[in-house]
Amino acid sequence: MKKGIAIAFLFILSACHQKVTIQDIPKLNGYWEIEKVILSNGTKKEYTYNESFDYFQIKANKGFRKKVMPQLDGRFLVNNQSEKIEITFEKDIAYINYKTPYAKWKEAIESLSNDKMVLINSSKTEYHYKKSVPINILGDGKKTK
C-alpha cells in the first residue's frame, strides 16, 4: 500500500512539472532579476535587491544576454558587453548555450513561465529569476520604456 501511494505521488509530481518547449522560448525575452540561488549542497542565498538585471533578446533561438543596471527614472545603464546565446534541445531539455570571446558554457532551463524562470548550470547551481520591469520612483509622471 505504501509503495502504491509513493508511486502515485511521484506520478502526480512529475505530471505537474512542465517541460520547456520551443513555444516557451519567447518568454525569455525581457528583463530578469535573480530572486535566489541554490547551490548544489543546498545552501540558499536570497536576493531582495539587485544592482543589475539580465536582459535576454532571442529571435529564432539565437540572440544575446546583457547585464543592465536599473536607474530610478526607469531607464537602464548598459555597456557594450553581451553574451551570444543559442537555445538548443537535448533529450527534451532546453538549454541556453552562451558564448563570449573567452568562454563557452550552457545552462538548462528547468522552468519558464511569463514571470518566473529557473536555470541550472553544470555545477548544479539553480538560479531562480523573476521577470522585472523598469523602476520609476521619481514620480515625474513620465512613462518608462
Regions found by a protein language model. Give the residues of each.
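N-terminal glycine/threonine-rich, aromatic-flanked beta-hairpin/loop signature
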Residues: K45-K91
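Short beta-strand segments that buttress and anchor functional surface loops
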Residues: Y95-K99, M117-I120
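Short, compact, well-ordered microdomains
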Residues: E107-Y127
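Short, solvent-exposed coil/turn segments at beta-strand boundaries
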Residues: L28, Y55-F64, F89-I93, E110-M117, ...
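Edge beta-strand at a domain terminus
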Residues: I120-K145
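C-terminal motif of bacterial Sec signal peptides marking the signal peptidase cleavage site
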Residues: I12-A15
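Sec-dependent signal peptide recognition
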Residues: K2-I7
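N-terminal helix-cap/turn-to-beta initiation motif at the start of protein domains
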Residues: Q18-E33
